[in-house]
Amino acid sequence: HRKIKHILGTKYRDRVGRLLVSELFTVGQGGWSGFPPHKHDTDRLPLETRHDETYNFRFKPDHGFGMQLVQREDGKVGDAYHIVNGSTIILDKGYHPCVVAPGYEMYYFTILGGLSQRPLVQFFQPTHAYQIETIPGIKDMIAKFK
């Protein structure tokens, strides 16, 4: 799972427009982040908000690597991107979990820009949404974006 540190979180609501800026860390070595698969590419409250997102990745040790997945349509095969130290990914559509290889730690700096509002409402892929109940700390992480 992951640990999150908000740099421009909800407490700065009146001073930063529609930006959310955070640092995310994998906890332990290897593992998934952004799981269960989620998206935020459509304004349809109360289920989801439209936020474009940019990630910049770092690994420890710096020769580590991971994979960014992007599934643009539910039920269809998506894209997989090999990410290394310094990789930048821009996401504007689709479910987008990522994973770091065993034996490595992953950090990523993330900037989310809300197109209509600042608070983020993530829509979790229905086939995997039940995982929210099984992952320690995930509900607290979700609440911090609102």
Q: Residues of each region from the PLM?
A:
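Short, charged beta-turn/beta-strand-edge "cap" motif at the junction between a beta-strand
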Residues: 95-97
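Active-site region of the double-stranded beta-helix
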Residues: 1-85, 100-146
